[in-house]
């Protein structure tokens, strides 16, 4: 394991009013063995699932399973109710109301801005250039980050562009911002990319936080489980401000069952299929006259600009995609998720028909 090369960020950047904060001590946080539990005002009437009892603050078996999957230590993991909660926790831990700022490139995932607004944090952005293929210029990025920035969000692969940030570039950013800013790398779509996860360097860079999710490649969006991966000191602080019992027992047991070896093998196969279908859809789109611009993607979606607005026409064919008009001020730009083989086949058929109609106008 690599040694931490910076050690000043966790304590020094935390909100001043939280520096001596004492977390709520729940009944379940008491680490003792007992046969008769009379300390939490729960119903004493048990069933076989023990649903009358509060769950663990951080479900041990689930945390250990995820640590194995992500190849990190269990002390480096915090499970949350979706990545949105992880994002919110970071704002609450580090950013002071109407004093600090957060930074991101755009277009990117919209919840960073929402979380900033809810906490009264100034949200600054650097607009990625289409002519540069939406790739980040590290020098330009660093030059635009304000001095009062506590959190920098990097989504890789980025939503909605699908572009990955090379690990070497992220390391450069981490080094430049050490001691001054926490770098939050959102890897919601990393399983679809060929880039290596930055979770491998969490113990090298103290100012690194990684966000993972079970909502995308793992196919568990309905179970709402996010994962924060960072150094153990920061995990301790995040646990202090996290709700006492965030993960229901039913969520834990369902996810553990879905993370057995057989299901993990199926998930790996599905990821391969998504990548193959992504390439298949990309090639099909590249042949259509109705397509104006097409961007390659490392995620499970493709960003496309069409020559005319087809969003409602797709809905008329019972196909729902995501409009990117709010990012690009252009209703012809769509983000299309990669579906099953049959779903993609139907999508291509409809798009080919729309393209033929466009050509005859």
Curated annotation (Swiss-Prot):
Swiss-Prot/TrEMBL keywords: Amino-acid biosynthesis, Aminotransferase, Histidine biosynthesis, Pyridoxal phosphate, Transferase
Cofactor or coenzyme needed: pyridoxal 5'-phosphate
Pfam families membership: Aminotran_1_2
Its EC number(s): 2.6.1.9
CDD domains reported for this sequence: AAT_like (cd00609)
This protein's pathway: Amino-acid biosynthesis; L-histidine biosynthesis; L-histidine from 5-phospho-alpha-D-ribose 1-diphosphate: step 7/9
InterPro entries, A to Z: Aminotrans_II_pyridoxalP_BS, Aminotransferase_I/II_large, HisP_aminotrans, PyrdxlP-dep_Trfase, PyrdxlP-dep_Trfase_major, PyrdxlP-dep_Trfase_small
Record-level GO BP terms: L-histidine biosynthetic process
Modified residues (N6-(pyridoxal phosphate)lysine): 216
Organism superkingdom: Bacteria
GO molecular function: histidinol-phosphate transaminase activity; pyridoxal phosphate binding
Catalysed reactions, as listed in the record: L-histidinol phosphate + 2-oxoglutarate = 3-(imidazol-4-yl)-2-oxopropyl phosphate + L-glutamate
Family per similarity comment: Belongs to the class-II pyridoxal-phosphate-dependent aminotransferase family. Histidinol-phosphate aminotransferase subfamily.
NCBIfam families in UniProt: hisC (TIGR01141)
Subunit-level organization: Homodimer.
Name of the protein described by the UniProt record: Histidinol-phosphate aminotransferase
Gene that this polypeptide is encoded by: hisC
């Amino acid at each position: 394991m690599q040694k931490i090369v910076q050690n000043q960020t966790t304590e020094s950047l935390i909100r001043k009013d939280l520096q001596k904060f004492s977390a709520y001590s729940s009944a379940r946080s008491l680490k003792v063995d007992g046969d008769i539990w009379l300390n939490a005002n729960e119903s004493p009437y048990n069933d076989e699932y023990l649903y009358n009892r509060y769950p663990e603050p951080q479900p041990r078996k689930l945390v250990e399973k995820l640590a194995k999957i992500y190849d990190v230590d269990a002390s480096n993991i915090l499970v949350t109710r979706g990545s949105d909660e992880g994002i919110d926790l970071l704002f609450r831990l580090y950013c002071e109301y109407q004093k600090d700022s957060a930074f991101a490139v755009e277009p990117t995932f919209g919840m960073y801005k929402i979380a900033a607004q809810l906490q009264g944090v100034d949200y600054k952005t650097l607009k990625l250039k289409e002519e540069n293929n939406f790739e980040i210029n590290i020098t330009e990025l660093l030059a635009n980050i304000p001095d009062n920035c506590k959190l920098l969000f990097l989504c890789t692969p980025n939503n909605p562009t699908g572009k990955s940030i090379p690990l070497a570039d992220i390391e450069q950013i981490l080094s430049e911002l050490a001691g001054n800013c926490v770098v939050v790398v959102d890897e919601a779509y990393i399983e679809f990319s060929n880039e290596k996860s930055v979770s491998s360097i969490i113990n090298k860079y103290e100012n690194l936080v990684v966000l993972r999710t079970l909502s995308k490649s793992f196919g568990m969006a309905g179970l709402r489980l996010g994962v924060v991966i960072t150094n153990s000191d920061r995990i301790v602080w995040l646990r202090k401000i996290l709700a006492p019992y965030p993960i229901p027992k039913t969520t834990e047991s369902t996810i553990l069952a879905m993370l057995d070896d057989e299901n993990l093998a199926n998930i790996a196969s599905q990821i391969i299929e998504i990548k193959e279908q992504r390439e298949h859809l990309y090639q099909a789109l590249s042949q259509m006259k109705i397509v104006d611009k097409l961007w390659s993607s490392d995620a499970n979606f493709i960003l496309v600009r069409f020559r005319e607005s087809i969003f409602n026409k797709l809905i008329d064919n019972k196909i729902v995609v995501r409009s990117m008009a709010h990012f690009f001020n252009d209703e012809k730009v769509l983000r299309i998720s990669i579906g099953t083989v049959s779903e993609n086949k139907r999508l291509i058929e409809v798009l080919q028909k729309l393209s033929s109609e466009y050509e005859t106008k």
